[in-house]
Amino acid sequence: MTDWTPKENFMAVLGGEIPQSVPRYNMGMKTMNGRETTRGVGPSILRKMDSHMSPKGGKDIWGVSYVANEETGFASIPEPNNFILDDITKWRDIVKAPEIDLDIDWEAMAKKDMEDAEIDRNVTAVYSSAMLMPFQQLVAFMGFSEGLCALYEEPEEVKALLNYMTDFYVPIIEKTIEYYKPDCYYMLDDTASRYSTFFSKEIYQDIFRPIYDRLAAPANERGLPIGFHNCGRCETFLDEMVGFGVKWWDPAQHDNDLLGIKEKYGRDLVITGGWEVQLMPSWPDVSDDEVRQTVYDTVDKLAPGGGYMFIGGILVRPGDEKAAHLHKLVQETASEYCDHYYEKH
């Protein structure tokens, strides 16, 4: 039998089918030597205006300063105690949408951006993104304390701010989908800790759901499957997410009732993840066999019946040879075990 490509397995599971292999999701990053399940693309005109994902930190397109360090694998966060907005009612004086010429040659830009990305579209699915993380952007402007207070004290001002940013992004999202022709669409917003959501379902429905609806609309109107990245115990919000078109959810951390979620949604919501180092109580004093077993156990728990993709790894600090070894071990074990899983089980 011919081996399915990562893209074929990925698109099959999003379509509610049983794939040949359990897809190994990579969140769009170039990490699998050209055999990635997904890769993200987007207009370079925005990337040139945004430096906040740099290993040295920088500013996002809204003027928020970010910092990064080696302990986080150079993942960036808003610079502590350097927030640009301390009063949500004053956002109109502070937050200014960048000026972008929507009449640029989108076809030429898309052609060059796709060539630069070096993606084999027969092997790898391409996604475009929503570009805006509404809650995360709010706390990037204000910090967690002030941002959460604003949700309760000035909900109409928060709505106005989020709609202002959405007004900026939606035309760009529509142009991106039109010219880059992605296979799917990706949204992100972390709204929970490992213990609970940061705010109530009522606030989600009142403030955030209308924004997510607007951000999802360009994909839904074109029939693109939607993924959503939401860390933590966010199961309270899954009905809403499915309601605006989400087909896969990552990283599906084990603090959620994953088996209950799988039973409730079946293949309509693809659980993507379920593995993390907290599964090993003795971490980091673990053997290779223990690490391998956690991968086997996670896949065997969540893959039967379809509706599942594996994602797992260890954030590696530069110079930490043990963490690097274990991260590689997780990837190799998952690759071997997920390959042709549904033919072997």
What would you call each of these model-derived segments?
Residues 38, 44-46, 67, 77, ...:
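Intrinsically disordered, low-complexity, compositionally biased regions/tails
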